[in-house]
């Protein structure tokens, strides 16, 4: 665990395990049965709307929104993830390699909805990222965000300073392969302040239950309700 004064942030190198991660993500409790259903619910009716998926990974949320009638675009920092997404959505899809922390390759005011599911917690400084996401949104457009719930860090790292912006890493396993992901924790007050400082209006914050159709064998002992991710719907004035 490291504070901001000693570590320069770096993106997780998904290229090393893109296929393994995609396979694990497609049917996992936290992604397939928790995060994606809530992201789709908060995005609302996307038929005929232009939707950007920021940090799209291998594209499952893009596929779901396209199937609901959206005109989708997406970007991710990992070329390997983008290759998988392009295979799923077709070679003519607007899927690009781009960095959430850098200026984005899109014009101003072009998207009705922007989704950013489980990507911002890889970013140390949210200000430039949120400024860019707001820039590409049309006035009145909706930004839907999912992050690791800050309270998860408080529960799992009780000896650490909850109120400090902190870099930490965790190992995951799938089919015998181990991969490491590195995150930036920030307290809830800093999450909310970042959105407000970006000029966004918070219209909803949710801690949902898992999808009612979740296979029972995937659920934890506490059932459908547990603390995992925190979701926001925001509006660009």
Model-predicted segments: where are they?
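Core SAM-dependent methyltransferase catalytic element
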Residues: 200, 217-237
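A short SAM/SAH-binding and catalytic strip from SAM-dependent methyltransferases
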Residues: 112-126
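Short alpha-helix
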Residues: 182-205
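A short acidic, Gly/Pro-enriched loop at the edge of an enzyme's catalytic core
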Residues: 104-113
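A short glycine-rich, Lys/Arg-flanked "PGG" loop and its adjoining helix->strand segment in the class I
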Residues: 127-142
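Class I SAM-dependent methyltransferase SAM/SAH-binding core
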Residues: 52-54, 58-102
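Conserved class I S-adenosyl-L-methionine
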Residues: 2-47, 60, 64, 81-84, 142-172, ...
